[in-house]
Every structure is written in C-alpha cells, then in structure tokens.
C-alpha cells in the first residue's frame, strides 16, 4: 500500500501497517495477520504480503543515502496509515468506552471503537464492518453517503457552480421538504 511504500523508501524495510491492511478483507479477524486460506482461495501469491506492523511501532531509521543528503538521522514510526484510523485516533473523546465518530469526506464513516470484532450475521445484514484501529482495537463502522452526491452534481454541471452556489440554490428551492435517501443502493454503482 502507498504508505508502506513511502516507509520502505525511507528505511529500506518492508512491512504492511495494520489499519490500512485491515481494509483489504484479507486479514484474519482473530489473528490480525494475513489470512493465507483466503489468499490461496483467491489464487493470490502470499509472498507479496509483508509482516503486519501495528501503528506506533518503530520501523527503523533512515537509509544511509537519505541521511547523507539531509544531514541527520531520524526514527520512522508506523502511523495509523488508513486515513479514518488516524482521524479516529485524533478525535477528542471524554470516555473511550463510549465513543462514537463521524468522519466525513467523499464518503462518511459512522462508527465506534470496540475491543473485539463483531462478525455476527446481524452485522453482515446491516452492512457493518470491522476495520483495524489503534492499539489493536476495531473500528466498527458503517460506510454512509458523504459529499459524493454534491461532488458529482457539481461535476455534471461542468463545475459551473461553487459548492456555496449549490447550497444557496437548494435553500431557495420551492419544495424544501423533498427527502432523498442518499444511502439507497442506486447510488452505489451509478453511471455518472
């Protein structure tokens, strides 16, 4: 993954960071390492995968060639390289046992952190997922619509209007009580 490649360029060491690796659906939930049975089933060679490294673990120090160019050395630490994992880690919380978050962008992620994964049938039916978090926690979450719709409306209007313009037009609409279920499955694979 891209963050792992940057760490390799800095240190010359190959690892896969846990939070990002967890989003591949190729990690074993129980062991938090690559699931070689799934890889074999999918005919994916296991030798392209590296050891899983937890965030905040030292990867090592800069390669000699980089140290010579910049004139100093520094230790490279694995960050939670999945953007939502970093966002959740940085979010303020008064009580880590009762913590909800909404991380919004093109897509939004609504969830909490839990100590043990939840792979129940009910979770599957509700389309909830378990992604790796900091300190071996799980980000138990649901992907929901974020700004994707308004980004695509803007694009389909050839960027003629700013986001502010679109919001102003929507607020002046005659019928302000139209409800669009932005999480309807029709938006998951649109033609536009």
Region roles according to the model:
Residues 36-56:
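A conserved helix-loop-beta module that forms one wall/lid of the active-site cleft
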Residues 19-21, 46, 135:
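Short glycine-enriched loop/turn motifs at secondary-structure junctions
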Residues 1, 8-13, 26-28, 32, ...:
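Active-site core segments that coordinate phosphate-bearing ligands/cofactors
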């Amino acid at each position: 993954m891209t963050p792992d490649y940057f760490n390799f360029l800095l240190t010359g060491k190959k690892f896969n960071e846990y939070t990002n690796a967890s989003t591949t659906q190729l990690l074993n939930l129980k062991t938090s390492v690559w699931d070689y049975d799934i890889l074999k089933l999918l005919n994916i060679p296991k030798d392209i995968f590296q050891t899983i490294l937890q965030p905040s673990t030292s990867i090592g120090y800069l390669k000699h060639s980089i140290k010579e160019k910049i004139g100093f050395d520094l230790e490279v630490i694995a960050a939670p390289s999945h953007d939502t994992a970093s966002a959740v880690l940085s979010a303020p919380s008064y009580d880590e046992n009762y913590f909800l978050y909404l991380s919004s962008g093109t897509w939004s992620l609504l969830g909490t952190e839990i100590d043990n994964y939840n792979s129940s049938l009910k979770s599957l039916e509700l389309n909830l997922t378990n992604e790796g978090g900091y300190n071996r926690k799980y980000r138990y979450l649901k992907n929901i619509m974020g700004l994707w719709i308004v980004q695509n409306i803007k694009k389909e209007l050839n960027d003629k209007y700013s986001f502010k313009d679109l919001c102003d037009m929507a607020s002046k609409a005659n019928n302000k009580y139209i409800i669009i279920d932005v999480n309807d499955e029709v938006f998951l694979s649109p033609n536009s």
